[in-house]
């Protein structure tokens, strides 16, 4: 779960704070778990919501939204062939502005729909879609600049959300 928090946090200390706050919520809400679905999924949902609430509370999300462990991410082998590069991609995702990073994480990695993201972040569904598109574009530019990804000859979708 620390990896989940780390994707949303600015640094390890913030991630640890989010995780601690999330587990406090998990333990205080334990009586509400109804054995419908996986226990880990229930915990993950609480942790993700805790991270989102933390970003909102600290106004980090809204500020960056105004400016323009990668599990769940599939990278096409012909574009990015190595595990080392996959780790580099995760680090490049952390470079994205928090708004872009948050939407990218929620949609492509956590598997939320744009409607769910819009509800969680109090934004329009179209904003979620555009933030996701911009995040992918910015991430691709960063990866090309860092020579992790070669510029494709034709438009390809190399980052695909796993559903």
Located regions from the model:
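Arg/Lys-rich amphipathic alpha helix in sigma70-family domain 2
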Residues: 31-35, 45-65, 82, 134
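Structural recognition of an alpha-helix C-terminal capping motif at a helix-to-coil junction
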Residues: 3, 17-24, 37-49
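Internal acidic/polar
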Residues: 53, 61-86, 113, 158-160
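Sigma70-family region 2
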Residues: 7-10, 21-38, 57-59
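Helix-turn-helix DNA-binding motif, specifically the short coil turn and the N-cap/start of the second
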Residues: 11, 113, 122-127
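A short pre-motif secondary-structure segment
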Residues: 103-107
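Short, charged helix-capping/linker segments at alpha-helix termini
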Residues: 2-21, 148-150
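C-terminal edge and immediately downstream basic/flexible tail or linker adjoining helix-turn-helix-like DNA-binding
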Residues: 63, 119-120, 136-163
């Amino acid at each position: 779960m620390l990896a989940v928090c780390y994707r949303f946090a600015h640094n390890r200390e913030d991630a640890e704070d989010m995780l601690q706050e999330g587990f406090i919520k998990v333990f205080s809400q334990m009586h509400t778990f109804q054995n419908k679905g996986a226990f880990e999924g229930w915990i993950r949902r609480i942790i993700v919501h805790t991270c989102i609430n933390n970003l909102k509370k600290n106004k980090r999300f809204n500020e960056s939204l105004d400016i323009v462990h990668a599990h769940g991410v599939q990278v096409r082998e012909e574009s990015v062939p190595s595990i080392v590069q996959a780790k580099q991609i995760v680090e490049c995702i952390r470079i994205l502005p928090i708004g872009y990073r948050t939407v990218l994480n929620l949609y492509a990695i956590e598997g939320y729909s744009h409607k769910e993201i819009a509800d969680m972040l109090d934004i329009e569904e179209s904003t979620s879609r555009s933030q996701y598109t911009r995040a992918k574009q910015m991430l691709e530019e960063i990866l090309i600049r860092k020579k992790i990804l070669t510029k494709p000859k034709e438009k390809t979708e190399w980052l695909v959300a796993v559903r």
